[in-house]
């Protein structure tokens, strides 16, 4: 999305705050998956993404995120 220059700093801080509320483990896996995929063929990247997704789904933080969403509360991520 395009943000006016005058609003860029505030929007950046707001986005950073949203990211900081997420699971550090899941963010690490996501970043690694995207970076790794940039150097792969599409088929290899999709296979890699599928393998990494299993790590995400098995993570305790993923379960905590789902439970928090269903219970309409803030998630308490542990990085595990």
What are these regions (language model features)?
Residues 1-47, 54-55, 60, 76-80:
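C-terminal long alpha-helix characteristic of the crotonase
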Residues 72:
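Conserved N-box asparagine in the HATPase_c
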Residues 66:
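Flexible, glycine/charged-enriched surface loops at secondary-structure junctions
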């Amino acid at each position: 999305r395009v943000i006016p220059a005058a609003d860029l700093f505030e929007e950046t801080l707001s986005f950073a705050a949203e990211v900081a509320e997420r699971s550090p483990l899941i963010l690490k896996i996501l970043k690694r998956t995207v970076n790794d995929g940039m150097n792969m063929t599409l088929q290899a990247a999709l296979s890699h993404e599928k393998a990494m997704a299993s790590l995400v789904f098995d993570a305790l933080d993923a379960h905590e995120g789902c439970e928090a969403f269903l219970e309409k509360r803030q998630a308490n991520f542990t990085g595990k």
